[in-house]
Amino acid sequence: MNLRMKIRILLCGCGALALGALVARAADGVTKDGAPLRDALVQEASRPIKPAWRPMLLYLAELHGRSVFPATGHFKYPYESIGPGYQGGRVFGHIDLTHERFDTVRASPEHVRNQIRNELGGQQADGLIPGIVLFDAEGQPRWKNFKGFPPIWVVSAEVYVEQTGDVDFLNECLAAVRKQIGWFEAKRSVPGGGFYYLDLTANTWESGMDEGIRYDERPPAPAACVDACSHVYLLYDHAARWSKNLREPAADWEAKARALREFIRKELWDSETGFFFDQWTVRRPARRQLAFEGMWPVVVGAATAEQAQRVIDEHLLNPKEFFTPHPIATVALSEPKFELRMWRGPAWNCMTYWAARGCVRYGRRDAARQLLEKALDATAVEFGRTGTIWEFYHPSLGEQSLLRRKPTAQNTPSRDYLGHNPLFAMADLWRQAGGLPVK
């Protein structure tokens, strides 16, 4: 049976045959290196889900197939870009690549392992792992050698090992984590405790949250950022657990994780609002702003059980804040600075996925299921309206044309965007959280 026939069969009965033409056209651009990944994802799209989600998953499979290119530079394996529709052209890496690995690990574990190796292959002697990797006229990779990015890649490495049992791969990952920790400790530590991103001093957007509201008013000196602290805790925690798995000393990593966890719980938590904030605003009520980054201690497991439940119930599931018709809003609806621009309000599916992972971590499968189902429903509706996968979405199901990105020639969200849309992973976690029986 050829692929187009398989797609027609999968679309039968879901009232979406008209979208089959879109999927078929997308298939025309699939690369030689991307075809096996696309085929595996088409197969995954046949797993139990809501029928209304299947057309967008099949389209997403084609986008993955169009985004894999031959090995070049320090990439020893074919590499996957962040999507064919990104306005900046072909780009590799950043947090987008982690989301793509979440999306493809069940369909093609080998592809995920190779993308991790490609990413770690660019690690500098000082420990920095390149963030946004661009390509010059000859197709060779280049990046800024002073700017990092959130080190969430470790979670995708662990997911790969869980999927395959390839524990030996952790040797490569642990070596990279040790060096990356060294870079963060040398370059991004705050006197007195915690870590920060370079966004604190300039518009570098090292955090990946371009033009986020937290940096509208900056402190006079480096201070602990809630997201950076959470992400470095993630490094310490993984370094400790991987060391144990490989029968190597773990005590130092455990001690560092424990100390940073206590710092986050005590110094970045506000008991009045039941939310986490940056160090320079947490004790200043007039400066506190409800931005989604306050969920990160829950996502990484640094919050106490009580703190996590408050974040989930009072904020993530609050329809006046983050639980919008398309969740999650990146800035609470109740926040005066909420607007339909970039990370200042719109919904990004990748962050809904991270929020759901945090809910599951603290035993709230019910909350994860609600977040994921609502986001996938909304994404499917928008796919039916516009026939594409968007970089980010209107949190209240309004027209995408109302959204703004940055004041450039293309001040709208990118179309055909992979990096922030781990829809296969979201559907899988939804199943695990009780959405449908897992088969």
Give the residues covered by each predicted segment.
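Bacterial N-terminal signal peptides
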Residues: 12-21
